Amino acid sequence: IGFWLESDRMLCLDFSSKSLEVQRGVVMEEFKQRCLNRPYGDTGHLLRPLVYKEHPYQWPTIGKELNHIAQATLQEVEDFFFSFYAPNNAILAVTGNITFEEAVRLAEKWFGPIPRRELKKRNLPAEPQQTEERRLTVERNVPIESLYMAFRMCDRMHPDYYAYDILSDILSNGRSSRLIQHLVHDRQIFSRSAPNPPFRAVP
């Protein structure tokens, strides 16, 4: 049923004002719940513009502001869909009690008839090298103060990416990590430390 659902969505998604309003309401509620109505929920919205000045990564996937979702038009949604949602621009992940051969057969059955689409070439601006510290102090009604720091690292295709990933674990993932031991247990100036190495296409 998963093959049928996803292929149906890719082939003949229902573009109508009614369906747009339903989905708009769902996404706006998700935005409020995740980003506006819980402590530290807007951290990503505040941190991204400090890290990225040119690249679109400065905008969260769910939207930068609530009115961006509220003002999205049906034509914009349709244009975006047909620009990126195509079998020649998709990755299919299949899990469960199924063989490789059966997965290929079902993929060809359900996605094979869907025509390829001419994809727009993405010409994204390069993020310039950061040469100075960027800092933002925000006052919020939250349980405790928090400090978020971001450092430039290589992109996910760089051969050093996995070394950075392991290094982040050594530094701050788990009770025996360096930062947990030094800042949480020994000096007791933080209550926790959590790494989050990004899996992104640009540094």
Language-model features, listed with the residues they occupy:
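His/Glu-based metal-binding/catalytic segments typifying zinc-dependent metallopeptidases
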Residues: 32, 49, 119-176
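Charge-rich, well-structured scaffold segments of protease-associated domains
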Residues: 1-119, 137, 155, 163, ...
